[in-house]
């Protein structure tokens, strides 16, 4: 596991000494939650990564680390094999020393949709809830964010972040293996809070909104992306079983209902800034994610429905302010 000493110092400088102490006591134990065989494989792959310095780093328009000229052909083939040890790669894409890591999601498309609508990130402290492997965190740093903390309970995603961090060596971007429920309430120290693709997995969506609000300083901005359904303020869809083969989808609101939830939780300046029906081009199986993907989750005869007959995934991005 990464050495988080820089993170502890940064949190203490933000007035969060107690949280830094809690993390220092609990993060080392998180590794025990993953099987020894999996962790051993990841650690072996991590240790086998080449000791080279990237000739270029690009985070503004892409996430590009190094170039193909930094490696010989044999080293590149070995690097690709080591990267595949961290399969499946879900969030990206990354250009890694000339290797195109074509992830399941075109997360860059989502970033392009939301960036024009949010407060400028330059100089801001950001927490990204359910951040996956930290792809959007790198884009936030590229957009000028001063400090980015990603929280992600799945250790494989954290390990993928560490692969990139090994070469980017960015002391202002961290991903730690915790969930939002482990974040102390009412921190009130972040300028921007991102929660993308998380809300519908929460059994209590309003509690999740209050948790996000507690992370924000007064005047801070929430950026929330979630599944939605068409309807009015009283329309909330609760799947009777699976949704798009997912077991853990609980509540999918309409835009109007989501707006009402945000109002009831005390947010202001609420806006739905984007809606997008997920396409097979944006979410699909690739060489880097060889399991089922969106095409397998939809009705083969009607792409407007999931395999269970529910409305196909429609996503919306909301922005709101903590007064």
Swiss-Prot record:
This entry's Enzyme Commission designation comes to 2.5.1.-
Q: Does the UniProt entry include the keyword Transferase?
A: yes
Protein's name according to its UniProt entry: tRNA U34 carboxymethyltransferase
Tell me the enzyme class: transferase
Q: Which NCBIfam families match?
A: PRK15068.1, tRNA 5-methoxyuridine(34)/uridine 5-oxyacetic acid(34) synthase CmoB
Domain of life the protein comes from: Bacteria
HAMAP family in the record: tRNA_carboxymethyltr_CmoB (MF_01590)
Gene3D superfamilies found in the cross-reference section: Vaccinia Virus protein VP39
State one Pfam family annotation: Methyltransf_9
Q: Where does carboxy-S-adenosyl-L-methionine bind?
A: 91, 105, 110, 130, 180-181, 196, 200, 315
CDD domains in alphabetical order:
AdoMet_MTases
Q: Which UniProt keywords apply?
A: Transferase, tRNA processing
UniProt record, GO biological process: tRNA wobble uridine modification
- What does the UniProt record say this protein does? Catalyzes carboxymethyl transfer from carboxy-S-adenosyl-L-methionine (Cx-SAM) to 5-hydroxyuridine (ho5U) to form 5-carboxymethoxyuridine (cmo5U) at position 34 in tRNAs.
Question: What does the record note on quaternary structure?
Answer: Homotetramer.
The Swiss-Prot or TrEMBL record annotates one GO molecular function as: transferase activity, transferring alkyl or aryl (other than methyl) groups
Which reactions fall under this protein's catalytic activity? Answer: carboxy-S-adenosyl-L-methionine + 5-hydroxyuridine(34) in tRNA = 5-carboxymethoxyuridine(34) in tRNA + S-adenosyl-L-homocysteine + H(+)
Give the protein family: Belongs to the class I-like SAM-binding methyltransferase superfamily. CmoB family.
């Amino acid at each position: 596991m990464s050495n988080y000493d820089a993170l502890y110092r940064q949190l203490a400088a933000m007035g969060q000494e107690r949280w830094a102490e809690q993390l220092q006591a609990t993060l080392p134990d998180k590794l025990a939650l993953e099987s020894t065989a999996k962790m051993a494989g990841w650690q072996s792959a991590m240790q086998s990564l080449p000791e080279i310095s990237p000739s270029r780093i690009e985070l503004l328009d892409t996430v590009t680390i190094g170039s193909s000229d930094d490696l010989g052909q044999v080293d590149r083939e070995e690097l690709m094999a080591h990267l595949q040890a961290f399969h499946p790669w879900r969030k990206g894409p990354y250009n890694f020393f000339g290797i195109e890591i074509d992830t399941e999601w075109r997360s860059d498309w989502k970033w392009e949709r939301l960036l024009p609508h949010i407060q400028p990130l330059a100089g801001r402290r950001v927490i990204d809830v359910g951040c996956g492997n930290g792809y959007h965190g790198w884009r936030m740093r590229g957009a000028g964010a001063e400090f980015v903390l990603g929280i992600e309970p799945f250790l494989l995603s954290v390990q993928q972040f560490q692969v990139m961090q090994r070469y980017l060596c960015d002391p202002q971007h961290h991903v730690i293996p915790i969930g939002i429920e482990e974040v102390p309430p009412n921190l009130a120290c972040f300028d921007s809070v991102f929660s993308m693709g998380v809300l519908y997995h929460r059994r209590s969506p309003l509690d999740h909104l209050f948790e996000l609000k507690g992370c924000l300083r007064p005047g801070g901005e929430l950026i929330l992306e979630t599944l939605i359904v068409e309807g009015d303020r009283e329309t909330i869809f609760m799947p009777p079983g699976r949704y798009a083969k997912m077991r853990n989808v609980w509540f999918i609101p309409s835009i109007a209902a989501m707006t009402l939830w945000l109002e009831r939780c005390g947010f202001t300046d609420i806006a739905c800034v984007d809606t997008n029906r997920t396409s097979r081009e944006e979410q699909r199986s690739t060489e880097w994610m060889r399991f089922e993907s969106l095409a397998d989750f939809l009705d083969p005869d009607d792409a407007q429905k999931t395999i269970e007959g529910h409305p196909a995934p429609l996503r919306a991005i909301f922005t709101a302010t903590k007064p």
